[in-house]
Amino acid sequence: MKTLLLTLVVVTIVCLDLGYTRTCLISPSSTPQTCPQGQDICFLKAQCDKFCSIRGPVIEQGCVATCPQFRSNYRSLLCCTTDNCNH
């Protein structure tokens, strides 16, 4: 009986671990959302366009499979791998 109970506990833990997905803040509202499967990296990107001096940088947050390449019009780029780390 103890062996059966221990087996059920182990199977439950393994199944829960397999189903884990990342949560990241998603723009424009910065609310936490579950990322699609395979997108385990949170990112925060601040980029400038021709109106940057008036309204400030455009902020984008979300989930990605790989960190975006840094570009010259970016003010900053953050990629991280813990829940809701892209604030």
Swiss-Prot record:
Q: What Pfam families does UniProt report for this protein, alphabetically?
A: Toxin_cobra-type
Query: Which CDD domains would you find in this protein's record?
Result: TFP_snake_toxin
GO CC annotations? Answer: extracellular region
Q: What InterPro entries does this protein map onto? A: Snake_3FTx (IPR003571), Snake_toxin-like_sf (IPR045860), Snake_toxin_con_site (IPR018354), Toxin_cobra-type (IPR054131)
User: Where does the UniProt entry say this protein principally localizes?
Assistant: secreted
Annotated signal sequence range? 1-21
Which Gene3D superfamilies did the record assign?
CD59 (2.10.60.10)
A molecular-function term among this protein's GO annotations:
toxin activity
**Subcellular location per the Swiss-Prot or TrEMBL entry:** Secreted
What is known about what this protein does? Postsynaptic neurotoxin that binds and inhibits neuronal nicotinic acetylcholine receptors (nAChR) with high affinity (IC(50)<100 nM). Is a selective, and slowly reversible antagonist of alpha-3/CHRNA3-containing and some alpha-4/CHRNA4-containing AChRs.
Similarity comment text for this entry: Belongs to the three-finger toxin family. Long-chain subfamily. Kappa-neurotoxin sub-subfamily.
Task: Describe its partners and assembly state.
Answer: Homo- and heterodimer; non-covalently linked.
Query: What is the protein name given in its UniProt record?
Result: Kappa 1a-bungarotoxin
